[in-house]
Amino acid sequence: MSDINHAGSDLIFELEDRPPFHQALVGAITHLLAIFVPMVTPALIVGAALQLSAETTAYLVSMAMIASGIGTWLQVNRYGIVGSGLLSIQSVNFSFVTVMIALGSSMKSDGFHEELIMSSLLGVSFVGAFLVVGSSFILPYLRRVITPTVSGIVGLSLIKVGIIDFGGGFAAKSSGTFGNYEHLGVGLLVLIVVIGFNCCSSPLLRMGGIAIGLCVGYIASLCLGMVDFSSVRNLPLITIPHPFKYGFSFSFHQFLVVGTIYLLSVLEAVGDITATAMVSRRPIQGEEYQSRLKGGVLADGLVSVIASAVGSLPLTTFAQNNGVIQMTGVASRYVGRTIAVMLVILGLFPMIGGFFTTIPSAVLGGAMTLMFSMIAIAGIRIIITNGLKRRETLIVATSLGLGLGVSYDPEIFKILPASIYVLVENPICAGGLTAILLNIILPGGYRQENVLPGITSAEEMD
């Protein structure tokens, strides 16, 4: 097998290339447009579900951006053993949203006030992050269960998110406007523009395809009256990080639940970093790959420690950006530095970041549907790289069946205890846990003929 597995896309700027400032800026803005709303959404969802004050919710949003900027800087620059050295963007981990809501709602029903709820949720998040730090040092020993089979599930589970946004998002479902002509029309317009610009021969136009598509969709949304500016009217002018703003408290019961999600997030990080390495034309096996995995997971843990301390939900590497890399052809980690600085600035000045939250879901969905599909393709490539023997076929089929099945109807396991249900309702967790268990249970000697031969050259993957 070749040392480096190509992603099947033409890179304009490879990992160590230094793009001119204007091209780096376009690339950074493209990545920001892909992640900004998903980055701030978890804080908004948790704030609304727990009925937190507007001030607290705004602070959570700002700290999510600042922590993401710090984490991205660590990942792309790779200080010593910390960081993947890839264009790995950090953002809030959606896996924690339902857990935080469940734990916070339980405390709220018991009469705890907002400050104590936040101190407890952030406290267990702070301690739990050290589990990820520890896991980074034993990744080689977890190789039997954390495999490319597990990694490939990540991208495949994201397509539903893009489609829902394409139709207007969850808010549109609640209001009864989901899938109306306005949402579908705007989403389709963005999709067509992004595809069109990605077919251009001009590298600059190709790099800016997603950003241009979103701008065109935003203008169309303004004309249709779909843009709501109410969320930016009462935001403060500037926000400064305040470590342990709500104090620090700890619950061992909550730690067990949050700690489990943290350990499962290692699966997600391994998959995201593997996909990033692949689309960046770096090895997905061997010493360099293992070093990047260790550094990336270690950075995930350390950044979540920082995030929890300043008041953000836990962070992880973001899979969405792998689709941006593949579509734009920009894998330079130096673009990541620009992204990191911009995220910190957006966090310090929430009025600037608030503007991006006004982008309608349908506009984002038009671009994300294509990006998530590209991520799914990268995941499939990861799965088939080493070939699928009969044992691996059973593992892939079962884990994908349960993982994707849960994404279609998360309530299928609702009869289970709440502490278990919050794990298996997540497609990545459900599919990942299934793959892990089958990797442990199925005998290693059960390896018959290849059902799908492995890819051994870049040409075969194109």
Predicted segments with their positions:
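Hydrophobic transmembrane alpha-helices of multi-pass solute/ion transporters
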Residues: 9-10, 14-18, 193-196, 210-261, ...
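Hydrophobic, membrane-embedded alpha-helices of multi-pass small-molecule transporters
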Residues: 22-34, 179-191, 208-209, 223-224, ...
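Juxtamembrane interface elements at the cytosolic ends of transmembrane helices
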Residues: 2-7, 39-43, 47, 189-200, ...
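N-terminal signal-anchor module of multipass membrane proteins
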Residues: 2-88, 95-108, 137
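Intrinsically disordered, low-complexity non-transmembrane regions of multi-pass membrane transporters
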Residues: 1-26, 231-242, 278-288, 292-295, ...
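Membrane-embedded helical hairpins/re-entrant loop segments and their flanking transmembrane helices
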Residues: 21, 47-66, 70-85, 260-333
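Membrane-embedded alpha-helical modules
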Residues: 105-228, 338-452
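Short, non-helical or kinked segments that cap or interrupt transmembrane helices
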Residues: 59-60, 81-96, 144-151, 205-212, ...
